[in-house]
Structure formats: structure tokens, C-alpha cells
């Protein structure tokens, strides 16, 4: 059992039969009443994000997630095939299972397949990926106000806000956790 006071970002826990990873947490000590921990969690099975509040000192079960490296091979209709890089065993996911990850997935990309008690619960992308801009608006000359951005479509079809100096054909580094532009590659 893990005390909620020991929460940290990235920790995986089991609550009411669901497996969650901790995205954010905040220890709150009100002037009157008992302390509590407010947390933002992602359900690893469904991908949904939820907020939960725990009483200070409450205990939760840790979830032991096993992961193995697999390479994305190809898509066939609504099915996506991955291969274990050590055993060459293949595994297929449906579009619904990995919908969020498809925004950043390229052929031959290595990902982590997460399993809990023998059940495959999803894939984990690298923290950053390198993608090519396929379409973007031209930057307006003289528009130099701070933090001005424009929309750019990447090779996977994902649309991201980028600085004005980014042009078509450039390679960008995108953070898969925040879905934001990081830098040029």
C-alpha cells in the first residue's frame, strides 16, 4: 500500500479496480479541517482523465505495470500492428484503444506496451517525437508580438500551434505528453 502523501507524477495506482497514472497532485492543508490530496489521474484502460480527492494519509494499492519495447509496423483498416523487438511476436490494437497515440505514431517507431496482470492496457510513446510539417500558413512579416503562434499540420495529421518562423517541410520536436511544440529538430 502507498500513502497518498507519497504521490509523485508518473506513479501508477489501482483504485476501485481501475488502473490510473498520476498526472498532477497537490497537497492541501486548509486552515480548518483535515489535510487532503487533490490529484489529476489518467485511466490507463480508457485514456480518460479524472480528478480525485483523497484524505491525507489514505492508502491506495500500487499497480505494477510491466512494459516491453515494441515497434509499430503497419495499419490495416482500423487495426494497428506492433512487433516485439526481442521475440518478434506481433500484437494488434484497434483504433479505439490507441486513438490518442495515433496523433504521433509513425511507422517503425519504438513504443512501450504496458501490461497489468497479463492484460495489455495500452501503449506509451516516447516523451518527444520528431515530425515533419506538411502544411502551415505563412508567417506575417512584422508581427513580432510575443508568443504569436500559427497552426501547422504534421505528417500524422495532427495540428499543433507553432511559432511564426516555422515553415512547411521542417522537422519539429513535439512533446507527446503535452501535445505541444518543443523546438526545431
UniProtKB/Swiss-Prot annotation:
Q: Which GO terms describe its molecular function?
A: translation elongation factor activity
Q: In which pathway does it act?
A: Protein biosynthesis; polypeptide chain elongation
Q: Which UniProt keywords apply?
A: Cytoplasm, Elongation factor, Protein biosynthesis
Q: Which CDD domains match?
A: S1_EF-P_repeat_1 (cd04470), S1_EF-P_repeat_2 (cd05794)
> Which GO CC terms are listed, alphabetically?
cytoplasm
> Localized where?
Cytoplasm
Key word RNA-binding present: no
SUPFAM superfamilies in alphabetical order: Nucleic acid-binding proteins, Translation proteins SH3-like domain
**Where are its TM segments located?**
none
Q: What is its main location?
A: cytoplasm
PROSITE patterns hit by this protein: EFP
UniProt-listed InterPro entries: Elong-fact-P_C, NA-bd_OB-fold, Rib_uL2_dom2, Transl_elong_fac_P/YeiP, Transl_elong_KOW-like, Transl_elong_P/YeiP_cen, Transl_elong_P/YeiP_CS, Transl_elongation_fac_P
Q: Which GO terms describe its biological process?
A: peptide biosynthetic process
By sequence similarity, the record places it as follows: Belongs to the elongation factor P family.
User: What is the role of the protein in this entry?
Assistant: Involved in peptide bond synthesis. Stimulates efficient translation and peptide-bond synthesis on native or reconstituted 70S ribosomes in vitro. Probably functions indirectly by altering the affinity of the ribosome for aminoacyl-tRNA, thus increasing their reactivity as acceptors for peptidyl transferase.
Q: Which PANTHER family match?
A: ELONGATION FACTOR P, ELONGATION FACTOR P (EF-P) FAMILY PROTEIN
Protein name, as recorded:
Elongation factor P
The species is Brevibacillus brevis (strain 47 / JCM 6285 / NBRC 100599)
